[in-house]
Protein backbone atom coordinates (compact mmCIF):
# COMPACT_ATOMS: atom_id res chain seq x y z
CA UNK A 1 0.00 0.00 0.00
CA UNK A 2 1.37 3.39 -0.92
CA UNK A 3 2.60 5.68 1.83
CA UNK A 4 0.28 8.38 0.47
CA UNK A 5 -2.76 6.18 1.09
CA UNK A 6 -1.57 5.33 4.60
CA UNK A 7 -1.07 9.02 5.36
CA UNK A 8 -4.49 10.00 4.01
CA UNK A 9 -6.21 7.19 5.92
CA UNK A 10 -4.41 8.16 9.12
CA UNK A 11 -5.49 11.78 8.66
CA UNK A 12 -9.05 10.54 8.08
CA UNK A 13 -8.98 8.77 11.44
CA UNK A 14 -7.78 5.23 10.76
CA UNK A 15 -5.45 3.77 13.39
CA UNK A 16 -3.25 2.06 10.81
CA UNK A 17 -1.27 0.10 13.39
CA UNK A 18 -4.33 -1.55 14.96
CA UNK A 19 -6.00 -2.01 11.60
CA UNK A 20 -2.95 -3.69 10.11
CA UNK A 21 -2.88 -6.03 13.12
CA UNK A 22 -6.39 -7.15 12.14
CA UNK A 23 -5.09 -7.78 8.63
CA UNK A 24 -1.95 -9.52 9.96
CA UNK A 25 0.17 -6.89 8.26
CA UNK A 26 -1.14 -7.69 4.78
CA UNK A 27 -1.39 -4.23 3.25
CA UNK A 28 -2.40 -5.59 -0.15
CA UNK A 29 -5.33 -7.45 1.41
CA UNK A 30 -6.38 -4.29 3.24
CA UNK A 31 -6.26 -2.23 0.03
CA UNK A 32 -8.28 -4.91 -1.77
CA UNK A 33 -10.90 -5.00 1.00
CA UNK A 34 -11.09 -1.21 1.05
CA UNK A 35 -11.68 -1.14 -2.71
CA UNK A 36 -14.40 -3.80 -2.44
CA UNK A 37 -16.00 -1.91 0.44
CA UNK A 38 -16.45 1.14 -1.76
CA UNK A 39 -18.66 -0.84 -4.13
CA UNK A 40 -20.50 -2.76 -1.40
CA UNK A 41 -24.17 -3.19 -2.29
CA UNK A 42 -25.18 -2.42 1.29
CA UNK A 43 -24.80 1.33 0.64
CA UNK A 44 -27.49 1.64 -2.05
CA UNK A 45 -29.66 -0.88 -0.20
CA UNK A 46 -29.38 1.20 2.98
CA UNK A 47 -30.28 4.34 1.04
CA UNK A 48 -33.31 2.66 -0.53
CA UNK A 49 -34.48 1.34 2.84
CA UNK A 50 -34.03 4.82 4.33
CA UNK A 51 -36.02 6.47 1.54
CA UNK A 52 -38.87 3.99 2.11
CA UNK A 53 -38.61 4.10 5.93
CA UNK A 54 -38.05 0.35 6.07
CA UNK A 55 -36.45 0.36 9.49
CA UNK A 56 -35.85 -3.39 9.82
CA UNK A 57 -33.97 -3.46 6.52
CA UNK A 58 -32.10 -0.30 7.46
CA UNK A 59 -30.93 -1.98 10.63
CA UNK A 60 -29.68 -5.04 8.75
CA UNK A 61 -27.72 -3.04 6.15
CA UNK A 62 -26.38 -0.57 8.69
CA UNK A 63 -25.31 -3.41 10.98
CA UNK A 64 -23.41 -5.04 8.12
CA UNK A 65 -21.71 -1.75 7.31
CA UNK A 66 -20.86 -1.21 10.97
CA UNK A 67 -18.92 -4.47 10.97
CA UNK A 68 -17.10 -3.73 7.75
CA UNK A 69 -16.19 -0.15 8.68
CA UNK A 70 -14.98 -1.38 12.05
CA UNK A 71 -12.78 -4.06 10.52
CA UNK A 72 -11.35 -1.56 8.04
CA UNK A 73 -10.63 0.87 10.87
CA UNK A 74 -12.71 3.64 9.28
CA UNK A 75 -13.45 5.08 12.71
CA UNK A 76 -15.33 8.28 11.79
CA UNK A 77 -17.68 6.40 9.45
CA UNK A 78 -17.90 3.48 11.89
CA UNK A 79 -18.99 5.85 14.67
CA UNK A 80 -21.69 7.41 12.49
CA UNK A 81 -23.04 4.03 11.35
CA UNK A 82 -22.83 2.66 14.89
CA UNK A 83 -24.96 5.52 16.22
CA UNK A 84 -27.58 4.80 13.56
CA UNK A 85 -27.55 1.07 14.38
CA UNK A 86 -28.14 1.92 18.04
CA UNK A 87 -31.10 4.17 17.24
CA UNK A 88 -32.62 1.54 14.96
CA UNK A 89 -32.02 -1.26 17.47
CA UNK A 90 -33.94 0.65 20.14
CA UNK A 91 -36.60 1.86 17.69
CA UNK A 92 -35.66 5.50 18.17
CA UNK A 93 -36.90 6.29 14.69
CA UNK A 94 -37.16 10.01 15.36
CA UNK A 95 -33.35 10.09 15.39
CA UNK A 96 -32.85 8.23 12.12
CA UNK A 97 -33.07 11.19 9.71
CA UNK A 98 -30.29 13.12 11.43
CA UNK A 99 -28.13 10.04 11.88
CA UNK A 100 -28.58 8.98 8.27
CA UNK A 101 -27.47 12.45 7.17
CA UNK A 102 -24.34 12.06 9.31
CA UNK A 103 -23.59 8.68 7.75
CA UNK A 104 -24.03 10.12 4.25
CA UNK A 105 -21.80 13.09 5.10
CA UNK A 106 -19.11 10.85 6.57
CA UNK A 107 -19.23 8.51 3.59
CA UNK A 108 -18.88 11.50 1.25
CA UNK A 109 -15.91 12.73 3.26
CA UNK A 110 -14.26 9.32 3.06
CA UNK A 111 -14.83 9.16 -0.70
CA UNK A 112 -13.28 12.63 -1.12
CA UNK A 113 -10.28 11.61 0.98
CA UNK A 114 -9.81 8.39 -0.97
CA UNK A 115 -10.22 10.25 -4.24
CA UNK A 116 -7.14 12.27 -3.28
CA UNK A 117 -5.16 9.04 -3.09
CA UNK A 118 -6.44 7.59 -6.34
CA UNK A 119 -8.44 4.78 -4.69
CA UNK A 120 -11.83 4.23 -6.27
Indicate residue ranges for each PLM-predicted region.
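Two-component system phosphorelay core
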Residues: 1-120
Amino acid sequence: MADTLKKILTEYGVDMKKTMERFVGDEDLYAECLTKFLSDSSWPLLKNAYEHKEYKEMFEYAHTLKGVTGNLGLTPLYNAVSDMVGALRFEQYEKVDGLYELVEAELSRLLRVLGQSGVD
